[in-house]
A protein has these predicted regions:
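Short phosphate-coordinating micro-motif centered on Lys-Gly-acidic
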Residues: 41-47
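Short, small/polar residue-rich loop motifs at catalytic or cofactor-binding pockets
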Residues: 28-29, 47-49
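Glycine- and acidic-residue-biased ligand/ion/polar-headgroup-sensing regions
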Residues: 39, 50-63, 78-80
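Cyclic nucleotide-binding regulatory module and flanking cytosolic helices
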Residues: 1-38, 87-90
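Phosphate-/nucleic-acid-contacting segments
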Residues: 154-221
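Cyclic-nucleotide recognition modules
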Residues: 73-131
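A small-molecule sensor/coupling module
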Residues: 22, 95, 113-155
Length: 221
């Protein structure tokens, strides 16, 4: 695990921990590294899990799919991001999401039950870890609340403007990249891609934004 320490150090989950403490925790919870090719499923809806995933490299999409193949993207996970933690922390919980590799990826699987069970000596770094996990879960709730704000808008135009405005504020710039391609953005906002493309074209003609692929430049005029 030594080679992944640069990634682990930058992860909010390990905030305030030394390299030795991080390695000790990984050993304590029997952390396991897996690799998955693009398009493969890490978690499938209908299953249950005792582990959560930490992205070491590559990216995954957290999605919901119906029987007819309609896809709703809940979030995208890149290096240093987590997925599956609410389900792993709830014994017997059935996944209503799937996690699929957007590209070849390496993932660290962590047993949440062991993470939530303090060591016999109640080691200080384990207590820090539990506090960090609570913070990670709280941040995930905020992200989902933000998505609800976007998709609760009545029109495709309003959903786009809500999302792009939030991204601009989050990145503190009127010029920014988003983590989605056009189809993924449509799936994330729960709109039809064709209708979204029409609205983006209108917004450009109105001078409210300029976009190319996943790059956007907003105008406040």
């Amino acid at each position: 695990m030594q080679k992944y320490l640069p990634v682990l150090r930058s992860c909010p989950f390990f905030t305030g921990l030394t390299d030795d403490e991080i390695l000790s925790i990984l050993h304590c919870v029997s952390a396991a590294k897996i690799t998955r090719p693009r398009g493969s499923y890490i978690f499938r809806a209908g299953d249950s899990t005792e582990v959560m995933g930490l992205m070491l490299s590559g990216s995954t999409l957290v999605i919901q799919e119906d029987l007819w193949g309609h896809r709703n993207i809940l979030s995208k996970c890149s290096t240093g991001d987590f997925f599956g933690e609410p389900y792993a922390a709830t014994p017997g919980a059935i996944l209503n999401i799937s996690v699929v590799a957007e590209e070849d990826c390496e993932i660290l699987l962590l047993n949440v039950k062991r993470l939530l069970t303090s060591c016999p000596t109640a080691c200080d770094h384990h207590q820090k870890l539990i506090r960090n996990l609570v913070s990670v879960l709280a941040n995930k709730i905020l992200l989902f609340n933000e998505k609800i704000t976007h998709i609760s808008k009545r029109t495709t135009r309003e959903k786009l403007l809500s999302y792009l405005s939030a991204e601009s504020i989050r990145q503190a710039s009127l010029s920014f990249d988003i983590p989605f391609d056009r189809q993924q953005l449509a799936d994330f906002l729960c709109v039809e891609r064709a209708a979204m493309s029409v609205e983006l074209s209108k917004l450009q003609k109105e001078g409210l934004l300029v976009t190319k692929r996943n790059h956007f430049e907003l105008s406040t005029r």
